[in-house]
Design a protein with these regions (language model features):
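Local beta-strand/beta-hairpin segments that build beta-sheet-rich folds
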Residues: 1, 75-77
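Acidic, metal-coordinating catalytic segment for phosphate/diphosphate chemistry
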Residues: 1-20
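A residue-level structural signature of the nucleotidyltransferase/glycosyltransferase Rossmann-like core
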Residues: 13-14, 21, 39, 126
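Short connector loops at helix/strand junctions that flank enzyme active sites
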Residues: 16, 24, 37, 42, ...
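Active-site beta-strand termini and strand-to-loop segments that position acidic
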Residues: 23-26, 100-102
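Conserved Nudix-box catalytic region and its N-terminal flanking loop in Nudix hydrolases
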Residues: 24-64
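Unchanged
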Residues: 47-72, 81-138
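Charged phosphate-binding loop/patch that engages nucleotide di/tri-phosphates or the phosphate backbone
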Residues: 137-162
């Protein structure tokens, strides 16, 4: 079977199913900047056909952050539906956010690497930020940023935005 991400794009709409990891170390959060854009995101990526969200998270964290995590290292804390219009197209994103305990696996404060995937070549820049620093940057989506700042991780939140 071909490796196929759970996403499709048409002229009038697109759909994406992703997993995202909120990696916490020493009360700081790992954020990602893609190709020098003016905003930040959390590391993650698309789930593949036939892959569970947990398998996808383990794979994506390995690919993007270069650490091995196991099921006991993470737990679901938010289910996010993000529906909005961009360039005359309806964008529909389903994202599952996991709180990831990286332990001592990540020793670096910041780093970059070049990723070459089906969407092209891009530089991914990573850094750990405190909650106070997080308040000052543009982390997308905004509702997730607000959830992180509030530190509401005890249950599973369901957020619909757009």
């Amino acid at each position: 079977m071909d490796i196929v991400d759970v996403k499709f794009k048409e002229k009038e709409y697109s759909f994406h199913y992703r997993v995202v990891g909120l990696i916490v170390r020493d009360n700081k959060y790992l954020i990602q900047n893609i190709g020098g854009k003016d905003y930040y995101v959390l590391p993650g990526g698309h789930v593949r056909i036939g892959e569970s969200s947990e398998e996808a998270l383990i794979r994506e964290i390995k690919e993007e952050v270069e650490i091995d995590i196991v099921r006991e290292d993470f737990r679901l804390f938010c289910y996010h539906e993000n529906i909005y219009e961009k360039d005359n197209r309806v964008e529909h994103w389903i994202e599952q956010y996991y709180l990831v305990d990286s332990g001592e696996k990540l020793g670096k404060e910041s780093w970059s690497f070049v990723e070459n995937d089906v969407d092209g070549v891009k530089t991914l820049n990573y850094s750990f930020v405190s909650k106070e620093e997080l308040k000052e940057i543009d982390l997308k989506p905004l509702k997730i940023k607000e959830l992180i700042i509030s530190e509401e991780f005890s249950g599973i939140s369901h957020i619909i935005s757009g």
